[in-house]
Amino acid sequence: MICKSQTCTKIGGSTNSTFLALIPKNKGATDFSRFRSISLCNTSYKLITKIIANRLKKILSVIIPKNQGGFIKGRKILDNIMLVQEAIHSSYHRKEKGIVIKLDLTNAFDRVRHDFLFSVMEKFGFSKVLITWVKACIASPWIALLVNGHLMEFFQASRELRQGCPFSSLLYAIQASVLSFQLDYYQ
């Protein structure tokens, strides 16, 4: 059942249920980190999140810092890699001292704090209605592992953004923008 009001706080029933398929990254994978998880979301859920994603896409390129290349239409992470290489090369030839920091955000989608994300969205000026719909979509998802074609029991997830969900990468970009702003501030 999908809620019909603008104050929707929870998407109920099977709409917020997801099957999580684990695909081995290489042959003979036994450790959980050697699997890629794919979220097989309900079609109604995907439609709702696609509508929200389309709204987010219209404004993210304006509010997300230009140096943040990932997940924003028209930007590429490769551009940032080339920019860093050029900066290092230039500093080396001018004999300037500096520091380079590489951050590895492994499994970053699994470590999103929802309360922080919603706070950032409020600071950016997103409408309460949009934030409420995002909350309804990512709050209390029910997940069942799909192992060798068999479903395991459903459990409730708490802090992840679903990979394969139309707006997960955009929500992650919103949260990650805080780091970009902080790096710019202390530059």
What is each PLM-predicted segment?
Residues 1-187:
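Nucleotidyl polymerases of mobile genetic elements and RNA viruses
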